[in-house]
Amino acid sequence: MAEEQARHVKNGLECIRALKAEPIGSLAIGEAMAAWSEISDNPGQEQATCKEEEAGASGLSKPCLSAIGSTEGGAPRIRGQGSGESDDDTETLGFPSRNLQASSTGLQCYYVYDHSGEAVKGIQDADSIMVQSGLDGDSTLSGGDNESENSDVDIGEPDTEGYAITDRGPAPISMGFRASDVETAEGGEIHELLRLQSRGNNFPKLGKTLNVPPPPDPGRASTSETPIKKGHRREISLIWDGDRVFIDRWCNPMCSKVTLGTIRARCTCGECPRVCEQCRTDTGVDTRIWYHNLPEIPE
């Protein structure tokens, strides 16, 4: 379905390019639109046909392009008009040859066949060519001055340069869609999917979340209810004079200052115990022990 619509749009764009390359006079456009209005007002007239291959499974036929003012006698021709006399290809409208240039590719008539097989004709640009999404046989497209209220193209008065002023309104989505609309809808779904995936990557993974503890409250007291028990800090001094190794062990109070050298400090706070538990069981405390050989030092 989308491929058929894209093909119709492409053919319509070719018509627009031909008009821009060699624009037609405003008088010729007005007469062509008047003739088209007469056909639209009389649906009982003979309907236009074109030679084409059989339609595919989609039910849409290939468009037939017929140039106005392109050949014989200098008179512009358009398909599907006339009150009885017509050949297989074209029918003369009787416009004066001076209105259109003989070498111009001219205004092109674009034909679209709906699902019911009826031809829909219009002198309009590609944006106004829409294929109905339903299979209703009565739903046909019209063009020209007497377009239906569902049409999205209104051809206004021609300007001084000979171009037709076209006011394009938004096409109702419920009635049909163009190939560009299909592409836009697919692109929107892709962008939405990418947006959801990017949001999912921002979620923190379970088991790898870093929980930072809150900062401490300065109003709370820093001291605990139970005071820290004072104790002793074990000090060891090794002296080697080249012959023997002297080892001294003792405990300094916890309130004493730690220095680089070895000192025997005293308690200044009055809360440290006189003798710690380790000093009570260690027989080498406050006793200098010397060893003649290094392997004799216990580990």
Curated annotation (Swiss-Prot):
One Pfam family hit: zf-Paramyx-P
Region annotation Interaction with host STAT1: where it falls in the sequence: 110-120
Disordered: region residues: 40-98, 134-174, 204-230
Gene Ontology terms describing biological process: symbiont-mediated suppression of host cytoplasmic pattern recognition receptor signaling pathway via inhibition of IRF7 activity; symbiont-mediated suppression of host cytoplasmic pattern recognition receptor signaling pathway via inhibition of MDA-5 activity; symbiont-mediated suppression of host JAK-STAT cascade via inhibition of STAT2 activity; symbiont-mediated suppression of host type I interferon-mediated signaling pathway
Binding residue positions for Zn(2+) 2: 255, 267, 269, 272
Any one Gene Ontology cellular component term annotated for this protein: host cell cytoplasm
Localization per record: Host cytoplasm
Compositionally biased intervals (Low complexity): 134-145
Keyword terms: Host cytoplasm, Host-virus interaction, Inhibition of host innate immune response by virus, Inhibition of host interferon signaling pathway by virus, Inhibition of host IRF7 by virus, Inhibition of host MDA5 by virus, Inhibition of host RLR pathway by virus, Inhibition of host STAT2 by virus, Interferon antiviral system evasion, Metal-binding, Viral immunoevasion, Zinc
Record field: compositional bias (Acidic residues): 146-160
GO molecular function list: metal ion binding
Interaction with host STAT2 (site feature) positions: 240, 246, 248, 250
Residues annotated for Zn(2+) 1 binding in this entry: 232, 251, 276, 279
Family: Belongs to the paramyxoviruses V protein family.
Function, in words: Plays an essential role in the inhibition of host immune response. Prevents the establishment of cellular antiviral state by blocking interferon-alpha/beta (IFN-alpha/beta) production and signaling pathway. Interacts with host IFIH1/MDA5 and DHX58/LGP2 to inhibit the transduction pathway involved in the activation of IFN-beta promoter, thus protecting the virus against cell antiviral state. Blocks the type I interferon signaling pathway by interacting with host TYK2 and thereby inhibiting downstream STAT1 and STAT2 phosphorylation.
Self-association state and partner proteins as the record states: Interacts with host IFIH1/MDA5 and DHX58/LGP2; these interactions are involved in the inhibition of the host type I interferon signaling pathway. Interacts with host TYK2; this interaction inhibits the type I interferon signaling pathway without affecting the type II pathway. Interacts with host IRF7; this interaction inhibits IRF7 translocation to the nucleus. Interacts with host CHUK. Interacts with host RELA/p65; this interaction inhibits the nuclear translocation of NF-KappaB.
Entry comment, domain topic: The N-terminus interacts with host JAK1 and STAT1. The C-terminus interacts with host STAT2. The C-terminus also interacts with host PP1.
Name of the protein in question: Non-structural protein V
Taxonomic classification: Viruses, Riboviria, Orthornavirae, Negarnaviricota, Haploviricotina
Name of the encoding gene: P/V
